[in-house]
């Protein structure tokens, strides 16, 4: 929300820059696109290639943030890292802000009952089947978007319709069970 408010205040485009990483995710690329579609002006998805992984942090600031994205304001979390061996962080972004003509907004960590709210914590909650708490901490319902597959039609014996869906690759899936969906 901070980047959206900044863009409205400064009359500039709001841009979310996301890395397409090969790991378990809370949103597939398609879900992220749909989620942000009416919220930001642009979503830039950067493939997390070997070249990107080995790029030095200052080179990322210069080539990606400055020359390609023309960043005017950057919003990151306190534990944000980037560049080769994660050498870049919010302090480095702040250090080079004047040189490259942008400002930095660092979002402090949020906590729930003395536990840091993070993607790792949300993943743990989902894998433990605590979808209601995951939803509360996410601020939106956790979704799984996929294709319906024909199963053994066992749902008919439960007295209400059910669907079997193909699990998207790399998507965090709650434990096996029957979930109420809308």
Locate the predicted segments by residue.
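Nucleotidyltransferase catalytic core that binds NTPs
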Residues: 1-182
């Amino acid at each position: 929300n901070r980047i959206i408010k900044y863009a409205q205040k400064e009359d500039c485009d709001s841009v979310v820059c996301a890395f397409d990483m090969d790991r378990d995710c809370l949103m597939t690329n398609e879900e992220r696109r749909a989620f942000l579609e009416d919220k930001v002006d642009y979503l830039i998805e950067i493939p997390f290639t070997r070249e990107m992984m080995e790029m030095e942090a200052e080179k990322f600031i210069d080539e990606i943030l400055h020359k390609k994205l023309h960043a005017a304001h950057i919003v990151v979390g306190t534990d944000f890292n980037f560049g080769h061996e994660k050498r870049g962080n919010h302090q480095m972004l702040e250090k080079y802000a004047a040189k490259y003509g942008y400002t930095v907004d660092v979002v402090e960590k949020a906590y729930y009952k003395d536990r840091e709210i993070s993607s790792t914590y949300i993943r743990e909650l989902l894998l433990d089947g605590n979808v209601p708490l995951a939803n509360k901490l996410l601020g939106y319902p956790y979704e799984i978007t996929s294709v319906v597959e024909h199963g053994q039609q066992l749902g008919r014996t439960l007295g209400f319709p059910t669907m079997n869906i193909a699990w998207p690759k790399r998507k965090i899936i709650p434990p096996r069970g029957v979930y109420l969906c809308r």
